[in-house]
Amino acid sequence: MFEFITDEDERGQVGIGTLIVFIAMVLVAAIAAGVLINTAGYLQSKGSATGEEASAQVSNRINIVSAYGNVDTSGSTEVVNYANLTVRQAAGADNINLSKSTIQWIGPDTATTLTYDGTTADAENFTTNSIKGDNADVLVDQSDRIEIVMDAAEITTNGLKAGEEVQLTVTTQYGSKTTYWANVPESLKDKNAVTL
């Protein structure tokens, strides 16, 4: 069963040094494998979190159903003093809390970011009203409709005049953006409200 080799040239010898080198190589390989496994797990969890965030940004959006402006006829010229957006959830969106949203207003003479105020709209804030649904600031169902109210007379110099336009970008708490161009008609004469 065992064969004894008596010739010195055919015998292999393993010394203590060779054994130490072998053990060191095994330890280094084990540590490297552990680092690779940990890195792969970290990258997988990071990639999964990034994918979920990207999915939320794409799917948790609002749709702007309509926009109109209230016309102020008390001055020497007619102006839109309030701009209003009617919004709803986009298809497949989760609950959207408009009180945690912002609106970027880029108008003819002003650029500002509006935040939510539950009571009044002014130069720095917008407010909301429930048109359909139980909440005035949270879109829970796709059938819910909420009106966003912005005080154009406070945000811009004396309101929006005939023919002017403003770019409105609504950013939800998920980071998704919806942009709407509100265009004031060329004539506001004898009107109380106009489509923007």
Swiss-Prot record:
GO molecular function ontology, one term from the record: structural molecule activity
InterPro entries in alphabetical order: Flagellin/pilin_N_arc, Flagellin_arc
Superkingdom, natural source: Archaea
Principal subcellular localisation of the protein: other
One Pfam family hit: Arch_flagellin
Signal peptide: none
PTM statement from Swiss-Prot or TrEMBL: Glycosylated.
GO biological process: archaeal or bacterial-type flagellum-dependent cell motility
Propeptide position ranges: 1-12
Keyword vocabulary terms for this entry: Archaeal flagellum, Glycoprotein
Subcellular location: Archaeal flagellum
GO cellular component: archaeal-type flagellum
Record function comment: Flagellin is the subunit protein which polymerizes to form the filaments of archaeal flagella.
Family: Belongs to the archaeal flagellin family.
The protein's name in its UniProt record: Flagellin B2
